[in-house]
C-alpha cells in the first residue's frame, strides 16, 4: 500500500473503535465503583481478568485477552483511549472493522504471550506473579501498522507545536520500549515489543480482508469443490448405466448434463 503524506487530524468516533473504547471505559468505571462499594468483588475480578503469567500457565487462558479491558489508573487509561481512538478510527476507515479487530486482538494476544514467556523464564524476578493490565499490546500493534502502511503521514504532537511523520514516531516508541527493558518495568516493555512484532507480522502475512474472510472463503471453496466432485462421480455412474442400455448421454467436465448437439462451451443452456 502506498504511503501517504499530509497532516493527520482526529478521525471520526465510530464503529469497532468506538465500541472498544466504550467497553474499556465502562469496565474501568465499573471496577472503580466496585472498589468503593464492594472491594472484595473488585479484587476478585482483577484476579480473574488481569494477566498473571503464573495463573495463565495454570489454566487461566482467557487472561491473555481479558487483561486488555482492565485499567487501574485514570491518566494511563485516558492516554490509551485517546491513542486507540486516533489510530483505531483511522485504520478502521481504510481497512474496515473486521481487519482492525483481528489486528488489535492478535496484537493483544501476542503481547500477553510475550509477558507470559518473560514470567516463565525470569521467575527469580517475580514476574510470574506480576499482574498485567491495559490494552498497550493492541495499541502497539496498531501503531506499527500505522507506521508501516502510512509512514509519511504527518500529524501534530499535542501539546507541542510541531509535526512528526508516523514512521519516526514508531521508531521513537520502539526505542523507548527497548530502553525500558533495562528498568523494573521490563515485563511491560517486553509485552509492548511482542505486540508490535505480532502486529507487524499480521499486516505482512494476513489476507487483505483478514483471516476471518479468508477462512470463510476457504470453507465455501472446499464445500463447493466437494459438491462438484459428487456431481462428477454421479455423472460417470449414470454414463455407465446408460451405455448398458445402449444409450449415450453427455456431461461436461463439471458433471452437468449436456445434449449431444450442444456446444459444451456454451453455458447458457446448462441445467
Language-model region placement:
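C-terminal transmembrane module of polytopic alpha-helical membrane proteins
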Residues: 1-15, 25, 176-271
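Central hydrophobic cores of alpha-helical transmembrane segments
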Residues: 105-107, 160-165, 169-174, 195
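Membrane-interface micro-motifs in multi-pass membrane enzymes
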Residues: 128-151, 166
Amino acid at each position: 500500500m502506498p504511503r501517504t503524506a499530509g497532516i493527520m487530524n482526529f478521525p471520526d468516533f465510530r464503529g469497532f473503535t468506538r465500541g472498544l473504547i466504550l467497553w474499556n471505559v465502562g469496565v474501568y468505571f465499573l471496577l472503580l465503583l466496585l472498589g468503593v462499594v464492594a472491594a472484595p468483588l473488585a479484587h476478585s475480578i482483577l484476579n480473574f481478568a488481569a494477566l498473571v503469567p503464573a495463573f495463565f500457565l495454570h489454566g487461566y487462558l482467557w487472561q491473555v485477552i481479558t487483561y486488555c479491558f482492565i485499567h487501574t489508573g485514570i491518566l494511563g487509561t485516558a492516554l490509551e483511549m485517546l491513542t486507540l481512538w486516533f489510530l483505531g478510527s483511522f485504520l478502521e476507515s481504510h481497512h474496515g472493522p473486521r481487519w482492525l479487530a483481528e489486528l488489535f486482538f492478535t496484537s493483544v494476544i501476542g503481547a500477553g504471550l510475550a509477558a507470559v514467556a518473560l514470567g516463565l523464564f525470569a521467575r527469580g524476578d517475580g514476574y510470574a506473579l506480576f499482574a498485567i493490565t491495559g490494552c498497550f499490546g493492541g495499541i502497539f500493534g496498531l501503531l506499527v501498522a500505522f507506521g508501516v502502511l502510512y509512514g509519511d503521514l504527518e500529524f501534530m504532537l499535542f501539546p507541542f507545536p510541531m509535526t512528526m511523520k508516523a514512521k519516526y514516531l514508531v521508531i521513537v516508541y520502539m526505542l523507548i520500549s527497548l530502553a525500558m527493558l533495562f528498568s523494573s518495568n521490563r515485563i511491560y516493555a517486553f509485552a509492548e515489543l511482542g505486540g508490535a512484532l505480532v502486529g507487524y507480522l499480521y499486516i505482512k502475512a494476513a489476507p487483505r480482508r483478514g483471516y476471518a474472510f479468508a477462512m470463510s472463503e476457504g470453507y465455501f471453496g472446499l464445500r463447493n469443490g466437494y459438491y462438484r466432485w459428487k456431481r462428477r462421480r454421479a455423472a460417470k455412474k449414470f454414463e455407465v448405466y446408460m451405455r448398458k442400455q445402449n444409450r449415450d448421454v453427455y456431461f461436461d467436465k463439471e458433471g452437468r448434463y449436456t445434449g449431444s448437439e450442444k456446444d459444451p462451451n456454451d453455458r447458457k443452456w446448462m441445467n
